[in-house]
Amino acid sequence: MKETITKQLIAVQQASREIITLTDETINSLLCALADSIPSHQEAILQANQKDIERMDPADPMVDRLLLNASRLDAIAADIRNVASLPSPLDALLEERVLPNGLNLKKVTVPIGVIGIIYEARPNVTFDVFALCLKSGNATVLKGGSDAMYSNIAIVELIHSVLKQHGINPDTLYLLPAEREAAAVMLNAVGYIDMIIPRGSQKLIDFVRNNAKVPVIETGAGIVHTYFDKSGDLDLGKHIIFNAKTRRPSVCNALDTLVIHQERLADLPALVEPLQEKQVMLFADEAAFQALQGSYPDDLLHQAEPEHFGTEFLSLKMSVKTVSSLEEALEHITRYSSRHSEAIIATDPETTATFLKRVDAAVVYANTSTAFTDGAQFGLGAEIGISTQKLHARGPMALKELTTYKWIIEGNGQTRPA
């Protein structure tokens, strides 16, 4: 398997050198053609997706991530068109200066080269990643989860067909075999893949980080907190918490832990009351549990165990932590946060400012839902993931974050003195 994959990676490298020669107009034309082709291939894609769905437990929260339907395919097509409409991130002049010796220095954006993506049961990522990588001048190597195998194969077949129709090398996109051995080859493909981005659970991200020799940018895992301060507005808090927890519980920006100031425990039943509508299960510490007994359904209320804090639930479950001060809230968040998205609900300006300054996360919110952590919501277009690290990219990784830069130096015969 290694020999076969390596041979294909060499072809992908060659394709990456060809992509650099494409104009932005050519890339945009191809992306729009891909979006236009989705409706006519909808039946084949949905049939493949149904084969994947049938292999999963219907109660598994990952089913929502795996599911494709007509409306989701329409949204994917719209996202691809949106990527095509965005300005090219390439050849942007970042810096320019003329040195005393007359040399003209320019710092310009260029593609990274070959980007590898390893991800779990989200076939929409296959479309998104291809569009973003092509728009930013990169070739793409995909390692999808076995749960989405049939969906990914159908999607990549469509993309390859559109590439060929436009005279573009289909090796621009390579879908690795579903076997686990393929992931090991990918993670060690130094010299063939320039960067790997894992998208999925903390377990997947840890596996990639611990086993990759290729540079990695961590994305995805979100252990998300919202702190309801003693100065928090109750009505505001109810709407924010409901939205952050229930809008799409299986995504990485969904709320996992509500941290509440002990002086507002009397308001806790009202604060979480809307969650009953969605059957949200609460794991509350002792103080919060006592405050909720008799007001929150017994079958949905449980006493928290240590493991409930620091868990990315990805489902209709949420932990509740009581704190005695802002300082204790910050300590709790620092201990358990994945540095993805964190929020405060407060009306006191000093408390809010302290929280925003001291919380170490890619995105920090005041009096709004963490569900907004999304490239499109930020006005960046579709994103390849949410980076939770600090090097190269942080937060939504859109087109700009899929480029690097090089220095271009022009002279007229200058030589460096001995």
UniProtKB/Swiss-Prot annotation:
Example GO molecular function: glutamate-5-semialdehyde dehydrogenase activity
GO process terms (BP): L-proline biosynthetic process
Residue stretches in coiled coil: none
UniProt keyword annotations, A-Z: Amino-acid biosynthesis, Cytoplasm, NADP, Oxidoreductase, Proline biosynthesis
Subcellular location: Cytoplasm
GO cellular component, one term: cytoplasm
Annotated InterPro entries: Ald_DH/histidinol_DH (IPR016161), Ald_DH_C (IPR016163), Ald_DH_N (IPR016162), G-glutamylP_reductase_CS (IPR020593), Glu-5-SA_DH (IPR012134), GPR_dom (IPR000965)
Keyword presence, Transcription regulation: no
Gene3D superfamilies, A to Z: Aldehyde Dehydrogenase, Chain A, domain 1, Aldehyde Dehydrogenase, Chain A, domain 2
Catalytic reactions of this protein: L-glutamate 5-semialdehyde + phosphate + NADP(+) = L-glutamyl 5-phosphate + NADPH + H(+)
Amino-acid biosynthesis recorded as keyword: yes
Listed pathway(s): Amino-acid biosynthesis; L-proline biosynthesis; L-glutamate 5-semialdehyde from L-glutamate: step 2/2
EC number in record: 1.2.1.41
Role, per record: Catalyzes the NADPH-dependent reduction of L-glutamate 5-phosphate into L-glutamate 5-semialdehyde and phosphate. The product spontaneously undergoes cyclization to form 1-pyrroline-5-carboxylate.
Protein family per UniProt: Belongs to the gamma-glutamyl phosphate reductase family.
UniProt name for this protein: Gamma-glutamyl phosphate reductase
Organism: Pelodictyon phaeoclathratiforme (strain DSM 5477 / BU-1)
